Amino acid sequence: MQTSSYHSVTSVIFDKNTQNHTSIAIWLLICCALVFAMVVVGGVTRLTGSGLSIVEWKPIVGTIPPISQGDWEILLEKYRQIPQYEQINKGMTLDEFKGIFWWEYFHRLLGRLIGLVYFVPFVYFMVRKRVDRVLGTKLLGIFVLGGLQGLMGWYMVMSGLADNVYVSQYRLTAHLGLAFIIYAAMFWVATGLLSPVNTHSADPASVRKLGRFARILTGLIFFMVLSGGLVAGIHAGKAYNTFPLMDGFFIPPALFVLEPWYRNFFDNITTVQFDHRMIAWLLMFTIPLFWFKARQLSLSWSGRLACHLLLIMLCTQVALGITTLLLSVPLTFAAAHQAGAVLLFTAALWVCRKLS
């Protein structure tokens, strides 16, 4: 009788924990979807040259958009004071200004929405003691990263308000990289709550070895994302619009024309695009190799599915990247390429989770 009662209590506790974990995981995945949208909107904001249209940072008051004609005139006048207007958009009409303003406004508004969607459930779960100390620490860490991302966004915008017509490529890349880190943290915690144990028929040592390979690939994809941030930051995609060669060269001659030499990796259009291409080539060889190795093991169906999706997303992303380059970075394909980077990264994270 005591044994039966013990099992009943244990079952109730287990079911309650499972429900809590499922709720938290769904909430985190919703936040992931919002961050995905944020990355895409941020990419469009950059591609349309809209990022400097709002020259102030007002986290609360800035939520209210301009309503009257006077409000719009004030905002346009503030924009006229920065170098980008003087050197690129001089003579811009109010209607033209509205076109770039709304992209930056929605980008910031989406950032505020993400903060709200994360903060309110986070406080609820903590107050109701739905999370243990370990999980609570992870969720708090993600919240702190989100706050830092808001500061990083404004720090990036500041770099284009005084002396430059565009934001710093260093700060842009840091802003993009931090978005991917936040996304990865939420996705990893969520998938861990949904599927804490993986069952494979394959030899555990072989699965661990494949898992190490997957983590290396994920790191390489993240590194490629950072490289893409530099490409975007210095508009390197507008040059060398040929493939597979760079205007007739596999290794172009202008790779190290800047001094000191290390500046070329960040400021030289030729070198920055070359680096991005080389990382892409490396992934084009290593991910299919990983896929073939995974096929040789008896993985779970979800593990096999994750590996298939990784290969599919690689092919999709390569096609989008080449098309974007050949067409000199059109808005639609460039935005799709940035979205593809998130999806490729997601597939790699899921593979790592399935092999962990």
Curated annotation (Swiss-Prot):
InterPro entries: COX15/CtaA_fam, HemeA_Synthase_type2
Keyword Transmembrane helix part of the UniProt annotation: yes
Membrane topology per record: Multi-pass membrane protein
Enzyme Commission no: 1.17.99.9
Gene Ontology molecular function terms on file: metal ion binding; oxidoreductase activity, acting on NAD(P)H, heme protein as acceptor
Location(s), subcellular: Cell membrane
Role summary: Catalyzes the conversion of heme O to heme A by two successive hydroxylations of the methyl group at C8. The first hydroxylation forms heme I, the second hydroxylation results in an unstable dihydroxymethyl group, which spontaneously dehydrates, resulting in the formyl group of heme A.
Catalytic activity, as annotated: Fe(II)-heme o + 2 A + H2O = Fe(II)-heme a + 2 AH2
Alphabetized UniProt keyword annotations: Cell membrane, Heme biosynthesis, Iron, Membrane, Metal-binding, Oxidoreductase, Transmembrane, Transmembrane helix
Record-given protein name: Heme A synthase
Entry similarity comment: Belongs to the COX15/CtaA family. Type 2 subfamily.
